[in-house]
Amino acid sequence: MSAKDFLVELGTEELPPKALKSLGDAFLAGIEKGLKAAGLNYAASRVYAAPRRLAVLVEQLEEQQADRSMNLDGPPIQAAFDADGNPTQAALGFARKCGVDIAEIDRSGAKLRFAQHIPGQPAVNLLPTIVQDSLNDLPIPKRMRWAARRDEFVRPTQWLVMLFGDAVVDCEILAQKAGRVSRGHRFHANREVRISSPANYAEDLRSAYVLADFAERREIISRRVDELAAAEQGTAIVPPALLDEVTALVEWPVPLVCSFEERFLEVPQEALISTMQDNQKYFCLLDAGGKLLPRFITVANIESKDPAQIVSGNEKVVRPRLTDAEFFFKQDKKQKLEGFNQRLANVVFQAQLGSVFDKAQRVSALAGFIAREVGGDEARAARAGLLSKCDLATEMVGEFPEMQGIAGYYYALNDGEPQDVALALNEQYMPRGAGAELPSTLTGAAVAVADKLDTLVGIFGIGMLPTGSKDPYALRRAALGVLRILIEKGLDLDLAAAVDFAVAQYAGKVKSDGLAAQVLEFIFDRLRARYEDEGIEVAVYQAVRAVNPTSPLDFDQRVQAVQAFRKLPQAEALAAANKRVSNLLSKAEGGVAAQVEAHYFDNPSEFALHAAIQQADQAVQPLAAARQYNEALAKLASLREPVDAFFEAVLVNAEDARVRANRYALLARLRGLFLGVADISVLG
């Protein structure tokens, strides 16, 4: 079947830069979906997205749908006609459904059947609807109208190119009549651009100073920014989201180096970087030591004959913003950081839980407790907790919310606070996302865990639990943050004790009955998802959860040991044996004796198992106490043979009550050894 290239380009006013890439991808996906639904095959497809246009090129698109046959089965013959051979309502209804007379229905089989040959339509007849549907389905939160038209789109449309082969597809979409005329660069080539063919689309626009390919513009910007940064003996900060946004702002990218006064470098560089990136869309430069250079790179949308004028203009624009940051920094430093707590006493953390200052006091006490438990400095952790929210009341954070914690760090250093106390003011918010950086100091870790536990206990205490996708206080993230810090930093904290301490801090503001258990359950449930992501089966998590370790680090060490144990050849048999033992002991009447009496043994397998258990107990107890769970389970794996022999040779529920009770006691000893690590019966 013959095929031609197809091109559609919708010209608009400037599209939202943060949405341009996703709009282009969605446009392509919609076209591909429509072609597939229509049964039109093609060789390849690609999207073009620039500030004033969205386009899709489809290579070697079939010119015609294939013919197809449609067979519809109706009611059985017996139900289709009465005794006199007249069609019943069922038969007549089937004919109406098929859009034909009953005489055209095939009655030769067991059921009525209608066979229809459907000739394929020309692709050119289908393309307008496919394009229109794709545009209608674009992820546009809020569409707009313009002029007196009723059409709606993300921005007013200006032109439409639609070519199938060399011919224009005759249609009108979004108030634009299709043609072959596009537009060039707004300044370099502000004229009509005739698209000679779909295949020449990109080159025709390139000659008019428009790089329609988003990926090409992105690569040019990235490469040129790196080259310019290297020429300045620096490295550019190029966040992917910023690179995408800048790419979406320009049709003909020309990166240029600009500078600012070195006096601004006295301001925390994070504030300068924030305002230059977020407000001005500049790429900042760092030296080899990670310090901000007094230079930045802007990306112009024009190849100017006088680039110095563009540079000068950008330098003038950025100066007031840097001056503002400098002013806020100097104003904040006029008083001690701790003094800002007075303002926080009037700022509500949560209506039922008190002020932000109340929270800081709770975090201070809890951070001191945690630091003491994990080997940190209690006094410095408590100090960091007290200062932890102070910068929220500063001018700097008021203007740059993303500076919370960072501003506190600089102000604490300015006040002469210890380095780890200052760092903790920023590290309290770590990790800021999945896989993000963790606190580098024990003081920071203590404050970070304390802050999250305080929030969990408080919000749970007033009954505002997360439901479904709603989690306004980010409690799931807080719980995962606690777990990551304690496990990945190797901090052995009894979480039950820490949560109890946190509950006590609220002193009547929350419903404390069962609160600690509820919070612990929520936190440890988050571990389940963590392990699933790591490829560890739920049964392994459940085996450890059954013995209820309250230290996340201890919990993780047990999980890793059970995961390794599962790979041993003895694991399956021992898990099954433990399950059998668990079932037997659950049915024991009158409890199970604590001591095993060897004189009640009447089978060699009992003596052998008892001796093996005693030997394993001596080896395993010190290993379990030292949390060498891998080694402990490896030792216990040696019990497989005596356990198998015991169950093969002995009837546990002997008729003699004393013998039966003694065998229960022996099995209880066996099960107790494994429960020192995990309940491996769950694995069976």
UniProtKB/Swiss-Prot annotation:
Its EC number is 6.1.1.14. It comes from Ectopseudomonas mendocina (strain ymp) (Pseudomonas mendocina). It holds the Pfam family DALR_1. One of its GO terms (molecular function) is ATP binding. The keyword Protein transport does not apply. This is Glycine--tRNA ligase beta subunit. Its main location: cytoplasm. It comes from the Bacteria. Keywords: Aminoacyl-tRNA synthetase, ATP-binding, Cytoplasm, Ligase, Nucleotide-binding, Protein biosynthesis. GO terms for biological process: arginyl-tRNA aminoacylation; glycyl-tRNA aminoacylation. Tetramer of two alpha and two beta subunits. Transmembrane segments: none annotated. Belongs to the class-II aminoacyl-tRNA synthetase family. It catalyses: tRNA(Gly) + glycine + ATP = glycyl-tRNA(Gly) + AMP + diphosphate. It is found in: Cytoplasm. GO terms for cellular component: cytosol.
